[in-house]
Amino acid sequence: MSHVDDGFRSLTLKRFPQTDDVNPLLAWEAADEYLLQQLDETEIRGPVLILNDTFGALSCALAEHSPYSIGDSYLSELGTRENLRHNGIAESSVTFLDSTADYPQAPGVVLIKVPKTLALLEQQLRALRKVVTAQTRIIAGAKARDIHTSTLELFEKVLGPTTTTLAWKKARLINCTFSHPQLANAPQTLSWKLEDTGWTIHNHANVFSRTGLDIGARFFMQHLPENLDGEIVDLGCGNGVIGLSLLAKNPQANVVFVDESPMAVDSSRLNVETNLPEAFERCEFMINNALSGVEPFRFNAVFCNPPFHQKHALTDNIAWEMFHHARRCLKINGELYIVANRHLDYFHKLKKIFGNCATIATNNKFVILKAVKQGRRR
């Protein structure tokens, strides 16, 4: 938990999920402060749009202006809602939209936290292009090291004249004025053929490894089990290639695709519809924080390629939460399979949670692990 006085409100903010006290990560950064410094409250006219507000620092500070918080992270929405409540601000003060929704027309102010993925930034700028005016104040912010020439060129190409500020506390801002430059249309998804399957994989802008099959998933797919039945989960599904493979290999099983990214879940749904339409009735698609709120003892197996970062921050908190949720939701003798970089040492984490762990396969970079939910552990 951390405190910030941004000139609009004095706030107490925390990350979601919370990090441990030994290695705490802040719920806000200098770019948030820098963005807010640019705004004199008397200047704010028309709707306020906030894009990629990681844990609600901007939304909480500007809550009296009833902002729209737009992004592709359910975790960020949960974190923002928690911080609104913690600071005594009504959750209804902020309207949450995902990035593929229609944005409000003629906003007065647009604040953008530059996302890690350039493709997501382009999708969001193209959506803004449809609603902003020459009078809209457009300001983006990030760590100085994360603003590149390609970032500035993208703003210039999609929206119009772009300048950048001097660095302040290692943060930098981008100012942009909309001038309606000519711009070719772009496809909604990026698609590629998945070798040895005949499948075409469709990827929305914020999907992990959207330009091709990542090597961890490739290794995982080579070792997926067959002859499973009941309900199984592709946890952190991304574009759904693991779940697709499980559907094909296990015709008696139903697959639940789960991710905190609406774009990932939409990509998974599209990929089942276009590649295995006959299996669609065996699927469920869920935008969620891991398996929060899912009943215990439901699933026969969970498959997971866990992230080890949240936005720009390296953390194993999300993976740790996924493992605990998986154990709670597995039936007795249900199995968790994960693929991970070898250096992350998830073997000992799984053994601590499940009381057991076995190595299924390994290569020079990745390891596939299996843990079984045993009845003697609660």
UniProtKB/Swiss-Prot annotation:
Top-level EC class: transferase
EC number: 2.1.1.174
Pfam families the UniProt entry points to: MTS
Subcellular location(s) per record: Cytoplasm
Keywords attached to this entry: Cytoplasm, Methyltransferase, rRNA processing, S-adenosyl-L-methionine, Transferase
Main localization (coarse): cytoplasm
Record keyword Transmembrane helix present: no
Catalytic activity entry: guanosine(1835) in 23S rRNA + S-adenosyl-L-methionine = N(2)-methylguanosine(1835) in 23S rRNA + S-adenosyl-L-homocysteine + H(+)
SUPFAM superfamilies per UniProt: S-adenosyl-L-methionine-dependent methyltransferases
Lineage top rank: taxon: Bacteria
GO cellular component: cytoplasm
One annotated GO molecular function: 23S rRNA (guanine(1835)-N(2))-methyltransferase activity
Task of the protein: Specifically methylates the guanine in position 1835 (m2G1835) of 23S rRNA.
Family under the similarity heading: Belongs to the methyltransferase superfamily. RlmG family.
NCBIfam families the UniProt entry points to: PRK15001.1
HAMAP family associated with the record: 23SrRNA_methyltr_G
UniProt name for this protein: Ribosomal RNA large subunit methyltransferase G
Source species: Salmonella typhi
Gene name tied to this protein: rlmG
